[in-house]
């Protein structure tokens, strides 16, 4: 199947917008907007994330390290845009969106799912990361930022 046909078909798959965040062993902070995040199992609670091998967060997501899946609210498009742009990479943590006291997380996200990396697998251009959920927190009402067809949904 040609890559272009697959890309067109995937534009019809609506999904919530998530930012993956982590801190490596030397204290450097990383964040990226992720399009491939899904729950994996409920017993034990686990989540699956796919990260391009070229992403700067890639090397921070190793077995035993912590990460956070930040599911964004509708008013957090700016955070998504900053965390998806190579040009804005240096600005990702230069704002008050974050709590960086431990595993970095977005303070007012729709939900924060904290994980410890349990397994990673290489698959062509990506690393598949399985996170064992340690705890989570979420907003009281549903206001999730959604994305499809190359843009944010109302």
Give residue ranges: language-model regions.
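Basic, polyanion-binding surface patches
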Residues: 1-154
């Amino acid at each position: 199947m040609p890559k272009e046909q697959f890309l067109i078909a995937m534009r019809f798959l609506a999904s919530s917008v998530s930012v993956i965040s982590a801190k490596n062993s030397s204290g450097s902070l990383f964040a990226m907007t992720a399009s491939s995040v899904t729950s994996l199992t409920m017993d034990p609670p686990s989540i699956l994330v796919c990260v391009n091998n070229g992403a700067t967060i890639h090397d921070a997501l190793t077995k035993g390290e912590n990460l956070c899946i930040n599911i964004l609210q509708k008013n957090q498009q700016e955070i998504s845009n900053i965390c998806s742009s190579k040009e804005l990479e240096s600005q990702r943590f230069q704002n008050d969106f974050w709590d960086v006291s431990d595993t970095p997380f977005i303070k007012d996200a729709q939900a924060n799912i904290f994980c410890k990396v349990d397994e990673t697998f290489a698959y062509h251009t990506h690393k598949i990361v399985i996170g064992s959920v340690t705890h989570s927190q979420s907003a009281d009402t549903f206001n999730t930022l959604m994305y499809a067809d190359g843009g944010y949904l109302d």
